[in-house]
Amino acid sequence: MKGPLILSLMIAAAVTPRAQASGVKPSLEVVVLGSGGPRAFGRAGSSYIVLIDGKPRILLDAGPGAFVRIGELNIDLGQVDIVLLTHLHIDHSGDLAAFFNARALTSDGPIKYRVFGPDGAGLFPKTSRFVDWLVGENGLFAYQKSFGAQETFSVRDLAIELNTGVTKIVDENGLIVEEIVTHHGDCPSVAYRITYHDKSVVFSGDMDASAVSNLVRLATSADLLVFNCAVLDPPDSPSQLYELHTPPKKIGETAKESGVGSLLLSHTAPDVEESKNAVMKSIHTFFTGPVEFATDRMRVQITHRPQGAH
């Protein structure tokens, strides 16, 4: 398939750091640890590892099963120090404590994490409180501090007002991470854009269609948009799910309006999997660029797309 989306399924290959040779262009890659949602149907919950110059650096969400995928792919966690959480539903955060534990047991020196996630509202705690509940001094897994590498956490609770705008949260050595508020029913949620030199990928997280204008602002001209696709077009999914997720036709419209290079559909549900052709057709009503469905253990090499090219 022509286009800037280069996909390869990694079953047994290790995802380990490799040296950045002199003169080699900077690389940005995504490993899909989990492409599923809250249902148990053979996929891990939403989770991704982002590699910078071949080195795993960023964990984005940590759904149930992500821990197993990390082991299957023999991912070296030694330099993963940035954690991005789109929201605090279980299917996006259930394996976070397991990740912290595994990282501590495979590292010699102290680990300093930067963790980002939404502020709290209603039934949902702010991210700093969530992390403290898991691994703080009086947390559920406080025992973790008694063995393994020493871990410290700098947690930033991101504003959740829809008019906040795009916010830059990391800017170092060519790596830029930005976020914007989205809408996922009553659950505070954000989307992230990761840019490394001239390459960029955007993760929508779970979101309904009411705040796609914010996603467009964040994703404008990105090389790859990873959009969670958990429902069919109305009326083919339960009506209440449209208050949580964006249907395919709106995904296609959003991708077109954003001017992204490629689209990767993740967080799929069984009925979406069974209707791939219809989903693709609906998306292509608006978006003419490359579209793929994510699978667990898929590895995506981000290729920069010249402005206006497909």
Where are the language model's segments positioned?
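Bacterial N-terminal signal peptides
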Residues: K2-A14
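Compositionally biased non-globular segments, especially hydrophobic aliphatic-rich helices
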Residues: I11, V15-S22, A222
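Binuclear metal-dependent hydrolase catalytic cores
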Residues: A19-V201, S213, A278-G308
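Residue-level structural signal for beta-strand termini and adjacent loop
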Residues: T182, D206-M207
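Cap/insert and terminal regions of metallo-dependent hydrolase folds
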Residues: S200, M207-M298
